[in-house]
Amino acid sequence: MANVVTEPTARTKAAARTRDAVKIYGKGQTEVRALDGVTVEFEAGRYTAIMGPSGSGKSTLLHCVAGLDTLTSGSAFVGDVDLSTLDDQRLTILRRDRIGFVFQAFNLVPTISAAKNITLPLLLAGRKGDQAWISKVIEITGIGDRLEHRPSELSGGQQQRVAVARALASRPEIIFADEPTGNLDSRSGTEMLTFLRRAVDEMHQTIVMVTHDPVAASYADRIVFLADGRIVDEMQKPTAERVLERMKRFGE
């Protein structure tokens, strides 16, 4: 199956992109080609979902373009920075200063309050942060009445709100979210997706989210579909029904 090359129009700036991205795990008979020549651009100020069957390369693509893993060949860029040109220290600084992350696991520091968890990346970077921006983040995520509570005193949904607020607090150029609703019940998951949607619409953030859930994907502006490590399709202005119908075709 040939790769579908997905690029924005000439007027659209890419917040992140890959070019002919290949990721191979193992060698010989155990070799797995997780990414097979993927070229894709993630547009600034938009919400993109990545979907595909299990083992299609969704999380591998996200991890490589976010600088959490390295490509076997090809290129990955955040803005105009080629990640392959950075040593470990510079890559760490880029992730800290320019990227926000939201994972299925909340990854909060258990011994400090929600408020301190939200601003911890700024503290580690030696930055004060924009207080007006942080206040807006707290408003959007609806965590204002729980700021002095430690993670153990919060529900799963509340902990994920704190994790999203932490990702937004540093005003990153792009946020990568890997199955962010995976550990949440239906109500908390819907709230989380609404927060991410508002972050794009009201705060002009850029979000790239891996998900297997058609309802979650319907919150995005665009969906990129992977199969066998290749981009096989994309969808603009998705609905849950259209996404579900498209996903069914992967089983044919």
Where are these predicted regions, by residue range?
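Pre-NBD coupling/linker segments of ABC/ABC-like ATPases
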Residues: 1-10
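Alpha-helix capping and helix-coil boundary motifs
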Residues: 4, 129, 239-242
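Conserved beta-strand-loop-alpha-helix hinge in the C-terminal portion
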Residues: 230-252
